[in-house]
Amino acid sequence: MSWISPELIEILLTVLKAVVILLVVVTCGAFMSFGERRLLGLFQNRYGPNRVGWGGSLQLVADMIKMFFKEDWIPKFSDRVIFTLAPMIAFTSLLLAFAIVPVSPGWVVADLNIGILFFLMMAGLAVYAVLFAGWSSNNKYSLLGAMRASAQTLSYEVFLGLSLMGVVAQAGSFNMTDIVNSQAHVWNVIPQFFGFITFAIAGVAVCHRHPFDQPEAEQELADGYHIEYSGMKFGLFFVGEYIGIVTISALMVTLFFGGWQGPLLPPFIWFALKTAFFMMMFILIRASLPRPRYDQVMSFGWKICLPLTLINLLVTAAVILWQAQ
């Protein structure tokens, strides 16, 4: 067995970790759709899905079977290649972004020294999926939804990136593992509270979640940029949205709440519990807040979020310089 070298073993272990972690993320995203419906029913004083299986436990399986057997229809005058490519990009962009998240010591798919920049790149790639879907569908509502989504996402990605620069300045690194280790004594949410608030708001907007779901507003745009999608293509958009929620929640935990760190319990359990809490907060926000107008969303971003991130960055830089003296 001389062909089994240490380098080959390391590659196989990395591939195994990647497969396990990414499968867990996809599974969490799928189950979150069921959990969201149950929790929304609880918040709104009604029953959620409770007919398929015991207490609705097989509802997700029924939805998957239905999605597989739906007609995979493509509009007559659409661009077939781009129309097919868009949901694949939407599904994989934020899924690949999870590769830089350390779920416990030693368990990270890609321990990159430019981890935060890689995440911002993947978040920017998701904009192309929206633009491709809106333009290739040959539908006016789809195109309007894509224009809204791209403008909103590009705007809030500015605040998303700026809100992370304070964390990078404090940790002295773009590496996610280094950022977690730098929070051994104090979580970043305390010195970077305004950065966390801005990151959370921008994260909801980048995921196109309520109340920032104007690109998909049913009352205005008839479901927005994926109105022409059906079957598994729509399923990729649908699951991709929940994968984005899982990724953003995991990044909140990693960047601001100490990652896997915590007493008594194993590191992975701490990471999972913290991430599940923020996933539930996404659902609570959807159940609690109304949808504002599109101009109000953009105005809020540029007039409130941008100054807040700049002030946070300036204060962080001043504190670091003061401590260095």
Swiss-Prot record:
Annotated TM spans: 11-31, 81-101, 114-134, 154-174, 186-206, 237-257, 265-285, 304-324
Membrane topology field: Multi-pass membrane protein
Keyword Acetylation applies: no
Gene behind this protein: nuoH
One Pfam family in the UniProt entry: NADHdh
Subcellular location: Cell inner membrane
Molecular-function GO terms, alphabetical: NADH dehydrogenase activity; oxidoreductase activity, acting on NAD(P)H, quinone or similar compound as acceptor; quinone binding
Cited HAMAP family: NDH1_NuoH
Enzyme class: translocase
GO-annotated cellular components: plasma membrane
Subunit structure comment from the entry: NDH-1 is composed of 13 different subunits. Subunits NuoA, H, J, K, L, M, N constitute the membrane sector of the complex.
Predominant place of localization: membrane
Biological classification of the source: Bacteria, Pseudomonadati, Pseudomonadota, Gammaproteobacteria, Enterobacterales
Origin: domain of life: Bacteria
Catalytic activity: a quinone + NADH + 5 H(+)(in) = a quinol + NAD(+) + 4 H(+)(out)
This protein's UniProt keywords: Cell inner membrane, Cell membrane, Membrane, NAD, Quinone, Translocase, Transmembrane, Transmembrane helix, Ubiquinone
Cited InterPro entries: NADH_UbQ_OxRdtase_su1/FPO, NADH_UbQ_OxRdtase_su1_CS
Family the entry assigns: Belongs to the complex I subunit 1 family.
Protein function: NDH-1 shuttles electrons from NADH, via FMN and iron-sulfur (Fe-S) centers, to quinones in the respiratory chain. The immediate electron acceptor for the enzyme in this species is believed to be ubiquinone. Couples the redox reaction to proton translocation (for every two electrons transferred, four hydrogen ions are translocated across the cytoplasmic membrane), and thus conserves the redox energy in a proton gradient. This subunit may bind ubiquinone.
Biological process according to GO: aerobic respiration
Record's protein name: NADH-quinone oxidoreductase subunit H
Species in which this protein is naturally found: Escherichia coli O1:K1 / APEC
